[in-house]
Amino acid sequence: MANDLVQARDNSQVFGVARIYASFNDTFVHVTDLSGKETIARVTGGMKVKADRDESSPYAAMLAAQDVAAKCKEVGITAVHVKIRATGGTRTKTPGPGGQAALRALARSGLRIGRIEDVTPVPSDSTRKKGGRRGRRL
C-alpha cells in the first residue's frame, strides 16, 4: 500500500500555465505558476530573431518556446496547461502563424501538455471598428 503511494507521487506532474499570445506582429510565450501571479519565463519571437518581419514567424515562435521549456525544466515544472490567444476584440480572432509552432515546440521539448484552451477576447458588444464608415480603401 505504501509503495503505491510513493509511485503515485513519483508519477505526479508539477504544472504551470503557458500563455501563448500569437498576433500577426509577434508571438509571446509566457509561463506562470497555476495562480498566474508568478512569472517563470517569458520569451518573445522578437527576442530570438534579428529582422522585424520575422518576429511573428513560426521559426521565431519555436525558438522562444524551446527557451521557455528549458527554463521551466530548471525550475522543476514538468507539465503545462496551454492558453492560446489571438489579438481579438475588434481585430482578428484567429491566432497568428506562431501560435501552432509554439505549442508544438513546447510539446516536443519534453513538457507534458494538460489542457489547451483558446482565451481570445471576444466582445459581447464592442466599440466601433477601425476604418471608418466606408472601410479601408486600397
Curated annotation (Swiss-Prot):
GO terms for biological process: cytoplasmic translation; maturation of SSU-rRNA; maturation of SSU-rRNA from tricistronic rRNA transcript (SSU-rRNA, 5.8S rRNA, LSU-rRNA); ribosomal small subunit assembly; translation. Its main location: cytoplasm. The keyword Nucleus applies. Keywords: Cytoplasm, Nucleus, Ribonucleoprotein, Ribosomal protein, Ribosome biogenesis, rRNA processing. The keyword Nucleus applies. InterPro entries: Ribosomal_uS11, Ribosomal_uS11_CS, Ribosomal_uS11_sf. One of its GO terms (molecular function) is structural constituent of ribosome. It is found in: Cytoplasm; Nucleus, Nucleolus. Residues 118-138 are annotated as: Disordered. NCBIfam families: PRK09607.1 (NF007176). Component of the small ribosomal subunit (SSU). Mature yeast ribosomes consist of a small (40S) and a large (60S) subunit. The 40S small subunit contains 1 molecule of ribosomal RNA (18S rRNA) and 33 different proteins (encoded by 57 genes). The large 60S subunit contains 3 rRNA molecules (25S, 5.8S and 5S rRNA) and 46 different proteins (encoded by 81 genes). uS11 interacts with eS1 forming part of the mRNA exit tunnel. uS11 interacts with snoRNA U3. uS11 interacts with MPP10. Component of the ribosomal small subunit (SSU) processome composed of at least 40 protein subunits and snoRNA U3. This is Small ribosomal subunit protein uS11B.
